[in-house]
Amino acid sequence: VFIFRLIKLLVGKTLQFFGETGASLTLKHEQETAAKPSAFDSVNFGFNIGQGSVLAVFETDHFAKQASAKLVSAYSAAESSTNAIGQREDGEGFKKAIMGAIESRQVDRNKIAVVKTHGTGTRSNNAAERSALDSTLSDQYVATSFKPAIGHTMGASGLLETCLLLDALKQTGKVPAIKNRTEHDPVFLSEDTKPRSGYILSLAAGMGNIYSAA
């Protein structure tokens, strides 16, 4: 059971952290640059600040298999964090988290079919996630980001976006496209796509150079 709460995007608030000016996209910024929130795009970039919450139930295998509720997904997770300030554009933080999750669960990386990216749309995050995914996965996955559509929720974004992806797959059988893409892209999706059968990889990042993969 997923319980979602999404609140209208907040505008006029700008986050400037990690020394990256204009890390988030505000209404004023959009008007000045003609850019719209998006990720992995050569024209549109950045994100609005959003609010939202999600409630999910996590159980061990023993209890999950006994529950009357239908099992939606199983997961294994790993995190890579340091005390450094800033995001490495070489993708090493994401790469360590991805490999940690793969090795912990003993998953064949070639069987990862869908990636829910952190997808803030900042230039540094685009470079970091692309680099990490290019060096760890095969070229047979599709990737999406929800932040251009719902904003960057503070704290709830990783779980909320993962649940939105699972719900979309359940309802439509497709991975949602990244909003405001300006070019055709079959990997970092410019249109809703039915994925091949396989695992889902969910990526997240936080302040203080913290990276998570599940």
Language-model-derived ranges and their functions:
Residues 118:
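Glycine-centered flexible beta-alpha turn that most often forms the glycine-rich phosphate-binding loop
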Residues 74-75, 143, 200:
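Conserved beta-strand scaffold positions in the cores of enzyme catalytic domains, especially
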Residues 1, 97-105, 132, 136, ...:
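Stable alpha-helical structural segments in soluble proteins, enriched in small hydrophobic residues
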Residues 1-63, 155-214:
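Conserved beta-strand-centric core segments of catalytic alpha/beta enzyme folds
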